[in-house]
Amino acid sequence: MEFKHYSVLRDETIENLNIRPDGIYVDGTLGGAGHSYEIAKRLSDKGRLIGIDQDADAIKAAGERLAEFGDRVTIVRSNYSDMKNVLHSLGIEKVDGIMLDLGVSSFQLDTPKRGFTYRSEDAPLDMRMDDRNALTARDIVNTYSENDLYRIIRDYGEDKFAKNIAKHIVAARQKQEITTTGELNEIIKAAIPQKVRATGGHPSKRTYQAIRIELNHELDVLRDNLDDMIDLLNPGGRICIITFHSLEDRIVKSNFKKNENPCTCPPSFPVCVCGNKSKGTVITRKPILPSEKELEENSRSKSAKLRVFEKNDL
């Protein structure tokens, strides 16, 4: 199956990266290389693009798609959390732009055996972005305590029926192991009142999101590495991040704001004495959203938000 990933907010991201032909750029979530292709074709022979992804299918597809650019492009199978080490191994200390597209790819959603989608009834409960990891969604569903299931569905899925869903999962697995998306869907459906199911979208959506985030440590990786990525930027360099739900967006918004104004002095102080220096400027006071045209062409873009931060000239 061809690796597909509609490049959400592609033109807006490319425009905000301010690409210089001889610059060095990093795509930390390479996917199908839709964004990376647009970056690479704007580079001269002196420019470089480093693409990072933990998904083996993405690495293969991106390698084929970007082959025409030759040595201009380097692809590395890793998590963007290891960006600094990846760049160091390539002899690169600073870059001119970084982008992250935090969405699950269309390929991942549309390949049932990957277990990301609740729309398939007989897929295995997998959800690993990196299949080298041992833990799967099946392990979480069948081994986490009721309290831990409740916690992740509440915190990562923001589902008001989290407690009941966790209770139903634990009750069901005591009879037999839960192994497929279809089995999990039926359990979740039974835990949500019928009148809510009729109007609230697919009942499994929030629980699947919660399990996926927990399994792949998505929020921890984002939260723990934003500061380091900003530090990797040259003066005037930009980081562009596309998020797909409020949990991610809040982390990015808060981090960019903190790096723009890190002062911890009380408001009553006439001058700053804490010594914390601004690293740059938030370019997007409000996030950039998909155009009407994009929303018509790709319904999966509807929750996307792009935020941009520019490193200070030191």
From Swiss-Prot:
Predominant subcellular localization, coarse grouping: cytoplasm
Biological process annotations from GO: rRNA base methylation
Molecular function as annotated in GO: rRNA (cytosine-N4-)-methyltransferase activity
InterPro entries with a match to the protein in the record: RsmH, SAM-dep_MeTrfase_MraW_recog, SAM-dependent_MTases_sf
Keyword set, alphabetical order: Cytoplasm, Methyltransferase, rRNA processing, S-adenosyl-L-methionine, Transferase
Annotated region described as Disordered, given as residue ranges: 293-314
Protein origin, superkingdom: Bacteria
Subcellular locations according to the entry: Cytoplasm
GO terms for cellular component: cytoplasm
Binding site for S-adenosyl-L-methionine: 33-35, 53, 80, 101, 108
Annotated EC: 2.1.1.199
UniProt-listed NCBIfam families: 16S rRNA (cytosine(1402)-N(4))-methyltransferase RsmH
HAMAP family associated with the record: 16SrRNA_methyltr_H
Sequence similarity: Belongs to the methyltransferase superfamily. RsmH family.
Protein name, per record: Ribosomal RNA small subunit methyltransferase H 2
Gene that encodes it: rsmH2
